[in-house]
């Protein structure tokens, strides 16, 4: 059986990892062994945080909607319930955007929600 020299393959693998670790601090960007650990951990954090980002944005939207709703004498849950009863189908992202950038429109939505609750 012929001898297999893997210098080219190893070099390519090392280059790939070190390229991914570019910009890391100290040995994490220069030493292969440390870079492998750093890149692996970074990948785990990225995977986790892609999911957390969705939760955090939803949380932010709800907080903004709640603050705007309370200015109109409603709690967040009452506003959402009122909008559902009034058959106004609008997602939290758009509702939060309206609450921040278009206050008159949000006031109209809050009024409709209040009327639907009565």
From Swiss-Prot:
GO molecular function: rRNA binding; structural constituent of ribosome
Record keywords: Ribonucleoprotein, Ribosomal protein, RNA-binding, rRNA-binding
One BP annotation, GO: ribosomal large subunit assembly
GO cellular component: ribonucleoprotein complex; ribosome
One Pfam family cited in the UniProt record for this chain: Ribosomal_L20
NCBIfam families linked to this entry: rplT_bact
PANTHER family from the UniProt entry: 39S RIBOSOMAL PROTEIN L20
UniProt function note: Binds directly to 23S ribosomal RNA and is necessary for the in vitro assembly process of the 50S ribosomal subunit. It is not involved in the protein synthesizing functions of that subunit.
Protein family (similarity comment): Belongs to the bacterial ribosomal protein bL20 family.
Stored HAMAP family: Ribosomal_bL20
Protein name: Large ribosomal subunit protein bL20
Organism: Hamiltonella defensa subsp. Acyrthosiphon pisum (strain 5AT)
Gene that this sequence comes from: rplT
């Amino acid at each position: 059986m012929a001898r297999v020299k893997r210098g080219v393959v190893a070099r390519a693998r090392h280059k790939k990892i070190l390229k991914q670790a570019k910009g890391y601090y100290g040995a994490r960007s220069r030493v292969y062994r440390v870079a492998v650990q750093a890149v692996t951990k970074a990948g785990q954090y990225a995977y986790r945080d892609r999911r957390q980002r969705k939760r955090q944005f939803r949380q932010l939207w709800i907080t903004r909607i709640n603050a705007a709703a309370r200015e109109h004498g409603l709690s967040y849950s009452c506003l959402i319930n009122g909008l559902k009863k009034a058959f106004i189908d609008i997602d939290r992202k758009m509702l939060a955007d309206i609450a921040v950038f278009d206050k008159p429109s949000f006031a109209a939505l809050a009024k409709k929600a209040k009327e639907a609750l009565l």
